[in-house]
């Protein structure tokens, strides 16, 4: 929800972000969500739940099928995709508790499916974070090397800027 708040999205989207797992993890139904939070929130929660139910037999199928289903969902309401991207970002931030094989699978899926969608939607900060977190999981040595080089260049840029300001 923090990511979506930073994007200054409406209250219904924020509520849907908080409630996005309710239909999957509790006995609450779409009708109950509608009666308590309104049809807009219920439709968003239902849309995210439907995306979560997609099952794939192969990575190629996953990419094609996910793009197709997400694009269809976007036609109805782009906020469904925004909630899903925020959820995936949160999941990537908290991968540590999962077994290594599961972490790698989720990281690959994130890199191949969700980061490109974030990019296409112009959500570049989310795209960058998803890519960083996926690389950190899939290629930890390369990630550390890259992070060190970026940090070194940042220090150099900051010192140049400081000299220019003086």
Predicted regions and their residues:
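Active-site helical microenvironments for divalent-metal-assisted chemistry
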Residues: 1-166
